[in-house]
Amino acid sequence: MSKQGNFQKSMSLFDLILIGMGAIFGSAWLFAVSNVASKAGPSGAFSWILGGAIILLIGLVYAELGAALPRTGGIIRYPVYSHGHLVGYLISFVTIVAYTSLISIEVTAVRQYVAYWFPGLTIKGSDSPTISGWILQFALLCLFFLLNYWSVKTFAKANFIISIFKYIVPITIIIVLIFHFQPENLSVQGFAPFGFTGIQAAISTGGVMFAYLGLHPIVSVAGEVQNPKRNIPIALIICIIVSTIIYTVLQVTFIGAIPTETLKHGWPAIGREFSLPFKDIAVMLGLGWLATLVILDAILSPGGNGNIFMNTTSRLVYAWARNGTLFGIFSKVNKDTGTPRASLWLSFALSIFWTLPFPSWNALVNVCSVALILSYAIAPISSAALRVNAKDLNRPFYLKGMSIIGPLSFIFTAFIVYWSGWKTVSWLLGSQLVMFLIYLCFSKYTPKEDVSLAQQLKSAWWLIGFYIMMLIFSYIGSFGHGLGIISNPVDLILVAIGSLAIYYWAKYTGLPKAAIDYDK
């Protein structure tokens, strides 16, 4: 039996930035620009700016939490500290679903691009894998598992090597496409042919939110970082600002480089005609060398992300077990390697599972985006509640303006959930309500030593209220097969008012005293 150990503090600020930027520049930039263009036209560039601004607000909140409480898997331990085990359990479930499926998305992206050279990997006329294509995905998952199984240092070194190449390619693409830029493309059918609704759709379902995934991995490895009180806030802010700039420029140069005659079919056709956008546009422009470079990067970028997310997810499973609402075996850390091997095995198994029901990149990205934003939404809530029930907590990074940034960031996360539409919200939030009922049915076995079940329920009703509110608004709203009873801007006003009320409800119904586990 492996000896129990502790996580090793071996990650520097540079490692953190590489992890954050690596998590952001995975498969999303290789697919999202054509999706965004098809939903928002030239105004899609503003989707990246607005999405980056929203993530920056949430990132500032995480910076305070991560610096004050540098915990491995912190993103699903903070809600336990502020609101108890029931809230932590619900957030843990949706976060693990999101991250295990993310690993699958990345290997699926690799297979779809490699199929350009080896068509036998993908079923003709679809994005689904053949048997050999699925075997390739499985082999990649095995590789990520082994890289993380042996040690934290092995993971960091592998991430560094991959990162060097994956950052060069987007910059090269930007430089090359500038020389093919056609300004008139920015006014075809108007700058914003679908209005603000198109920008909203691009953010929630076009891949914008999916692209900004660098927050969780940085916070999840907080317990393994050198000088976390300084390095976590710096890494978060740098990653968000730099990625927003690069994504926006990539979107503009892609739109500008599309041959103008191609746009005669309308913006919605761009998503179909450029399913592998940067490879397709390189071929269309006669830049075979660039197409080859993009495909090589399409193998390394998602591959590097899969490696990062395998690492991150194992830490999240570990944190869930530490919360007391998952089997204790998953809270064990190998003494020799500093890795939670049991958690890694579970992450590996779940990542294999998700390759089965969701065979393509587009099939999973919307669900993952909403699941991730639901896990992001807890950050401003926990931070606000901890300012009430943990006033003496040392906060090396004290976020000024929390009274404004906290409510705003929560409202924006609610907007993104709403924009994803009834089709996605119904089953995702519905499953959360089912998990709530399961927790109550098995409450005999849930942790109650520090916080009674009655107090856990009192501190969790706001979350159930939020889920029910979003289900109602999504059902009567106009996004994703809603009934269309309410439309813009009335729907957003109602969501904002309801979310603001729930924010303050959650802030003042946290635990009477924060249940902080000072054993990292």
From Swiss-Prot:
Induction / repression: Induced by sucrose.
Database matches in Pfam families: AA_permease_2 (PF13520)
Gene3D superfamilies in the cross-refs: Amino acid/polyamine transporter I (1.20.1740.10)
One GO MF term: symporter activity
Function (record text): Uptake of L-aspartate with the concomitant import of a proton. Can also transport aspartate hydroxamate and L-glutamate with lower affinity and efficiency.
Additional detail: Allows enhanced growth with L-aspartate as a sole source nitrogen source. Inhibited by carbonyl cyanide m-chlorophenylhydrazone and carbonyl cyanide 4-trifluoro-methoxyphenylhydrazone.
This protein's name: Aspartate-proton symporter
Species name: Bacillus subtilis (strain 168)
Name of the gene: yveA
